[in-house]
From Swiss-Prot:
The chain crosses the membrane at residues 34-54, 59-79, 113-133, 138-158, 194-214. Joins adenosylcobinamide-GDP and alpha-ribazole to generate adenosylcobalamin (Ado-cobalamin). Also synthesizes adenosylcobalamin 5'-phosphate from adenosylcobinamide-GDP and alpha-ribazole 5'-phosphate. It is found in: Cell inner membrane. This is Adenosylcobinamide-GDP ribazoletransferase. The keyword Transferase applies. InterPro entries: CobS. Pathway: Cofactor biosynthesis; adenosylcobalamin biosynthesis; adenosylcobalamin from cob(II)yrinate a,c-diamide: step 7/7. It comes from the Bacteria.
Length: 247
């Protein structure tokens, strides 16, 4: 299990992981690593939250929120934000399904993708600032948001088909079973409940689950399935929805 965790950490983040820690693990077995997603999210959110706490006393709430969001993006290499931008460029192009998928593979940033990035990043900064001004625990909120968003991404993998012939998302989409999905969601719920007691965290997770489930169904209808880009979009939007639900 530890080897699987390190493999997933190096796969979905840019955090330095010695290769020997995940050596010998077959790429086709990576789908089993879905259960580690909430734990990886917990780690990323905790680091981002620590950045906020350290900087808040020095430069104030808005700048602390800005840098915490920046650090979170850097730790993932902008991987999920790129998926969000590509998904919006494709889906909002109002073209045929095949053309949408082609647009999503285009490395160039379009208008819809750019607007989505601006909206999501700015919204995260504003919501974090508002939560801090209301006295909410930012470290716990960010850790829970990142854990839940990665956990609920399993809803776009279970019983969904991959919309392309090949790609990184094919490792997970349609490859995880009901037990893995339940374990992943269960771990995310435990983290949310422990970090944000009083049902606050669990309630926010329920809202996030509903939002991501609806997103998955809409993308399935539009694209005929899911891709790695739509998983990234779900994670980014999941973080934002969870934080909004805490207000």
């Amino acid at each position: 299990m530890s080897k699987l965790f390190w493999a997933m950490l190096s796969f979905i983040t840019r955090l330095p992981v010695p290769r020997r820690w995940s050596q010998g693990l077959d790429f086709e077995h990576y789908s089993r690593g879905i259960i580690t997603f909430p734990l990886i999210g917990l780690l990323l959110g905790a680091i981002s939250g620590l950045v906020f706490m350290v900087l808040q006393a020095w430069c104030g709430v808005p700048l602390a929120a800005l840098f915490s969001v920046l650090v979170l993006a850097l730790m993932t290499g902008g991987f999920h934000l790129d998926g969000l931008a590509d998904t919006c460029d494709g889906v909002f192009s109002a073209r045929s399904r095949d053309r949408m998928l082609e647009i999503m593979r285009d490395s160039r940033l379009g208008t819809h993708g750019g607007l989505a990035l601006i909206f999501v990043v700015l919204a995260k900064i504003l919501v974090l600032s508002e939560l801090a001004l209301r006295g909410e625990p930012i470290l716990a909120s960010l850790a829970a948001a990142c854990a839940v968003s990665r956990g609920t991404a399993a809803l776009l993998m279970y019983r969904h088909r991959y919309a392309r012939e090949e790609g990184l998302g094919n490792v997970f989409i349609g490859k995880i079973d009901g037990r893995q999905t339940c374990v992943t969601l269960g771990l995310a719920a435990i983290f949310a409940a422990v970090l944000l007691p009083g049902m606050h965290g669990v309630a926010a997770m329920v809202v996030t689950m509903v939002a991501i489930f609806i997103l998955g169904q809409l993308l399935k209808r539009t694209l005929g399935g899911q891709t790695g880009d739509t998983l990234g979009a779900a994670i980014e939007l999941g973080e934002l929805v969870f934080l909004l639900a805490l207000l």
